[in-house]
Design a protein with these regions (language model features):
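Hydrophobic/aromatic beta-strand patches that form the interior of the parallel beta-sheet core
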Residues: 50, 65-66, 92-94, 120, ...
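A donor-sugar binding/catalytic signature common to diverse glycosyltransferases
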Residues: 62-68, 219-262
Length: 385
């Protein structure tokens, strides 16, 4: 057990998505008398450090806590995503649902997955706001701000990436359906995601003036957007999981390419609760899903089975942190670990490769010489485009 931990939590958030995951926990922590702080500095010196990124450096935290910012996080690396996101460098890990709990338990035989104190099944804190009065008020505000007619059904388009003019494909797909189309794009910024920022801006310009089309501010919390909709359309975005948490049917388009590699790849979404279709069937499928209540029933059954802690994650998380601060016994939500065993050769190679990447990142961001080399590399890369 850790000794003499002060009631001070620093949330290390590198973007708005991570911050939205942390905010319910921060509110619960404040309610319990903790001092809280938000920072983008991955190397911040902390009493209690709360981490959600793909790249984490918790060495400067007296007590380090890690969780997921995305229910589909690193899905290309399942079932052992911990070979590239090491949890053994943390004290505590938090799991959002039954499936993640089972996946972690099965991977707990590998050292890279095992935090020093343990892993706990707590729930997904980002979804806690669904049960708040603030949530209802925010949705009313959005309806008023955009002038949305709530008597019409709404389709939400929220992709992980905008590519190949698919926003215009969505507008075309719904134009004869007598529905609203709500558009919620990823909050790309010109400095971090310049290409996506440019593409999204161009799509928004081409969408101006289209009837029954509402382009939401990209910083809008996804749960607010989902609350206004009756069905979600995406490809492999985490919004597909988040829609499920609100009992909203989801449509995953299987031939919308994802440009996170070159050449762009087909999307991956490993869950059966989504209706998976090619883009040519969009209009027909949206119409069918909106008229058939069985889709909602199926989603709700899945949610009830896998997310029993919905709305209580922040309380569960703070109960665990309180146990350490006040030196109390842990709750029964601690997940049992399997006996340790050696990693397969291929997994060892992934771990070694990731460690090298992390070392380079740390060098580039914690020394003046490293920062100079990193900026020079970025400049040369930009010049030779």
């Amino acid at each position: 057990m850790k000794k003499n931990i002060k009631k001070e939590i620093t949330f290390i958030c590198t973007d708005n998505v991570e911050r939205q995951c942390c905010e319910p926990v921060a509110k619960e922590a404040e309610r319990r008398g903790y001092k809280i702080k938000f920072t983008e500095n991955k190397f911040e010196h902390c009493e209690i450090g709360f981490y959600l990124s793909h790249w984490n450096f918790p060495k400067n935290s007296k007590l380090s806590v890690v969780t997921l910012h995305d229910l589909g996080q690193q899905h290309g690396e399942w079932p052992v995503m911990w070979k590239i996101e090491f949890w053994n460098i943390f004290d505590i890990a938090l799991l959002p649902n039954k499936e993640w709990t089972d996946m972690w338990h099965n991977a707990s035989c590998y050292k890279c997955s095992r935090p020093r104190i343990g892993a706990f099944f707590t729930g997904f804190p980002k979804a806690d706001r669904i049960a708040t009065q603030e949530f209802s008020e925010k949705c009313k505000k959005i309806i008023s701000e955009y002038g949305i007619d709530v008597t019409k059904k709404s389709v939400l388009y929220a992709p992980s990436w905008e590519w190949d003019g698919r926003q215009l494909e969505m507008i075309e797909a719904v134009k004869k359906l007598n529905v609203h189309l709500l558009i919620k794009q990823f909050p790309a910024t010109p400095d971090v995601f310049p290409e996506q920022y440019k593409i999204i801006s161009e799509m928004h310009k081409k969408s101006l003036g289209k009837p029954n089309v509402y382009t939401l501010d990209s910083s809008t919390n996804i749960y607010d957007a989902l609350n206004l909709s009756d069905v979600l359309v995406s490809e492999e975005s985490s919004t597909l999981y988040e829609a499920m948490l609100m009992d909203k049917p989801v449509i995953a388009v299987t031939d919308w390419l994802v440009p996170d590699v070159n050449p762009p790849r087909l999307p991956e979404f490993p869950y059966d609760f989504a209706v998976k279709i090619p883009k040519k069937d969009l209009a027909e499928t949206i119409k069918k899903v909106l008229s058939d209540k069985e889709y909602v029933k199926k989603i709700k059954e899945y949610r009830l089975e896998n997310f029993p802690n919905l709305g209580n994650a922040s309380k569960n998380i703070m109960d665990i942190i309180d146990c350490i601060v006040y030196k109390k016994e842990f709750p029964k939500t601690k997940i049992p670990e399997l006996p340790l065993k050696k990693m397969p050769k291929q997994m060892k190679a992934s771990v070694a490769k990731r460690k090298l990447v992390l070392a380079k990142y740390k060098f580039a961001h914690t020394s003046k010489f490293g920062e100079f080399i990193f900026k020079l590399y970025q400049f040369l890369k930009w010049r030779n485009r």
